[in-house]
């Protein structure tokens, strides 16, 4: 019996950021995304960790190397990649900018997705 994979939605800014990565980093990110699609919410450390100090209760980060991708599982059982970056050399300050941005993008995503779901 095969386990169904989780859908992953990617905001445009994250998609563009991933596309611009060097080959080695891109490959690490793709492997991490494959693991996320396969493991879903059961995926844990060291690849996934929970983010504190956010208004989103279940905000998490995907952690391939020094790359961080903030994501959340939405009410439709999908994951949405909200913010991505390489926090090398800025281990604390990166979150001060990334968390509010993730919260804003998630709010926008929820509104758009709810409209789409309502139209079906």
Identify the residue ranges that each predicted region occupies.
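Basic, Lys/Arg-enriched alpha-helical interface segments
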Residues: 1-66, 75-79, 86-120
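Conserved catalytic cores of phosphodiester-cleaving nucleases, focusing on short active-site segments
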Residues: 71, 81-82
